[in-house]
Amino acid sequence: MIWAKLLISVALGAVSIVAALGIGAVGNLIGAGIAGIDPVWDISWNQASSLVAANVLGLLFGFMLGVLIRSSAAAIVGYFIYNFVLAGLTAVLAENQEWFRDLQAWVDFKYTQGMLFEGWPVGGEAWAQLGVTTAAWLVLPLAVGLVLVRRSEVK
């Protein structure tokens, strides 16, 4: 049952970005028509695929919170705290503390996930940062949550 929810989360992330790109294309046509200019199609497949990956990671993070906390309401609150409060605090810390600015890409999953909205990481260090933060903030807590769910499920 839990694996079906995981697959649905991944599929939902991919489909939602495809739908958003379609809505954006229609908006581009309408906006260009209203403004009397030619529509601009400057998003590459590389950017579109990294958008899908960023969205899927975000949904997987929400899924992980749901599995780990095992309360939908608490997981939703945790997701918003993580995305808005913690992300804001780490941004302020990075802006004001040079030591954290240098460390942020290695410890802040939201920061490294956000880089995917600009395109795929370039270079080995950027991929390593994405891997380290994904492992620490997503994979490890998800594994713990899955073990806890498996122990608590009625057979």
Name each model feature, range by range:
Residues 2-70, 87-94, 110-136, 140, ...:
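Secretory targeting signals
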Residues 72-109:
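Transmembrane helix segments
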Residues 150-155:
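Short cytosolic juxtamembrane segments of multi-pass membrane proteins
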